[in-house]
Design a protein with these regions (language model features):
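Entry/capping segment at the start of metal-dependent catalytic domains
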Residues: 32-34, 39-104, 108-110
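Long, polar low-complexity intrinsically disordered regions
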Residues: 1-41
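Metal-dependent phosphoesterase core characteristic of DEDDh/y 3'-5' exonuclease domains
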Residues: 4, 102-221
Length: 221
């Protein structure tokens, strides 16, 4: 698909998702956060599943004008596929093969202002978006899944309450988190983090060439 056609698809997706998110947000007062003790964490972290996804994405987007520095981390099923033949773009081919064939499990976003300050008078500053994942169906590396389980990720919840990947991508488009030059993304060794997000946003496999991958990264982030 050409970049021109892809840009058109991005715009259409944004319009459709925006209409729905506005309808969802108009049914509640987003400026007054309704906290659910079962998903709230006293450390400033809120767990987001499909039942509170629309509300929390709206709450997050409302803060971005003043808190536009985003620390991002993802959890994914490990490195399952290996590239046997060494080549000039070995690392990118390995990244692409794994990202194309595996599913993102969790996206964590922490917001601050340019001084590194968390939002004032808000009960949390970090959103952990938990996506659909079924370990009986989806591919994973056993040691990675064990580590994630030990870290507290509940795979039964992900199977039953995880956010649909396509839905997540559609509404991420209208959240002001992406396609926004005012947002400053921060990640540590984040090629896989951005790779998984880019696959969701494009709605297809990662580009064949690394320079095209970089092109789309610069466009979205």
């Amino acid at each position: 698909m050409s970049s021109k056609n892809k840009d058109k698809n991005i715009n259409n997706s944004s319009i459709n998702a925006q209409s729905t998110i506005n309808a969802n947000s108009s049914q509640k007062s987003p400026t007054k956060l309704k906290l659910n003790d079962s998903i709230k964490d006293k450390t400033g972290i809120i767990e987001v599943y499909k039942e509170n996804f629309f509300e929390e994405l709206y709450n997050l987007s409302e803060l971005l004008e003043d808190y536009n520095y985003i620390g991002m981390d993802t959890e994914f099923p490990g490195t399952v596929f290996s590239i046997k033949n060494m080549c000039d773009d070995f690392y990118y081919k390995s990244l692409k093969t794994n990202v194309d064939n595996l599913k993102l499990i969790q996206l964590g976003i922490t917001i601050t202002n340019e001084k590194g300050e968390y939002p004032k008078n808000y009960p949390y500053h970090t959103w952990q978006f938990n996506l659909e994942f079924d370990k009986n169906v989806d591919k994973y590396h056993p040691s990675s899944l064990n580590l994630l389980t030990q870290s507290g990720i509940d795979f039964d919840k992900l199977k039953n309450r995880g956010i649909n990947h396509q839905t997540f991508a559609e509404y991420l488009m209208t959240s002001n988190l992406v396609l926004n030059p005012d947002i400053k993304w921060i990640s540590f060794q984040g090629s896989y983090d951005f790779g998984y997000l880019l696959k969701l946003l494009l709605g297809t496999e990662l580009p064949e060439k690394e320079d095209k991958f970089v092109y789309w990264l610069n466009k979205f982030f």
